[in-house]
Amino acid sequence: MLQPKRTRFRKQFKGRIHGVSKGGTDLNFGAYGLKAVEPERITARQIEAARRAITRYMKRSGRVWIRIFPDLPVTSKPTEVRMGKGKGGVEYWAARVAPGRIIFEIDGVLEDVAREALRLGAAKLPIKTRFIQRLAE
């Protein structure tokens, strides 16, 4: 699963996702992509599950690019622990995804294969997404 090799600080604030994505809104690598429509935190496990679903449907043909990276440590305290005594330990890593952000890109497969593969991948994610494709040049 994806996570940073090292970070400056072990823990971060929750933060909020305001407005639309500033960058990463256009297809840079592949011909087809999956674009976020709503804001949400996506965990490293969800990204990996979606990636596996996409590559499995494509039968290892073509190429997949993951355009988001889980760099946000999410902490939680153990169950039945009283309030206070500091912040909990890091449980998992997540990526903040704003509307308009490209999550996955695909190339080297037909459009109907790409559409179905990304539909299966989108089912593993907690947000609404949209299938997009590069305009014919």
From Swiss-Prot:
> Keywords, A to Z?
Ribonucleoprotein, Ribosomal protein, RNA-binding, rRNA-binding, tRNA-binding
Query: Which Pfam families does the entry mention?
Result: Ribosomal_L16
Q: Which CDD domains match?
A: Ribosomal_L16_L10e
Keyword set includes Ribonucleoprotein: yes
Assigned GO CC terms:
cytosolic large ribosomal subunit
Coiled coil regions in record: none
Keyword check for Transmembrane, yes or no.
Answer: no
Name the source's superkingdom. Bacteria
Q: Which GO terms describe its biological process?
A: translation
Q: Name one GO molecular function term.
A: tRNA binding
Task: Cite the PANTHER family for this sequence.
Answer: 50S/60S RIBOSOMAL PROTEIN L16, LARGE RIBOSOMAL SUBUNIT PROTEIN UL16M
Give the protein's function: Binds 23S rRNA and is also seen to make contacts with the A and possibly P site tRNAs.
* Family note: Belongs to the universal ribosomal protein uL16 family.
Assembly, per entry: Part of the 50S ribosomal subunit.
Write the protein's name: Large ribosomal subunit protein uL16
From which organism does this entry originate? Bartonella quintana (strain Toulouse)
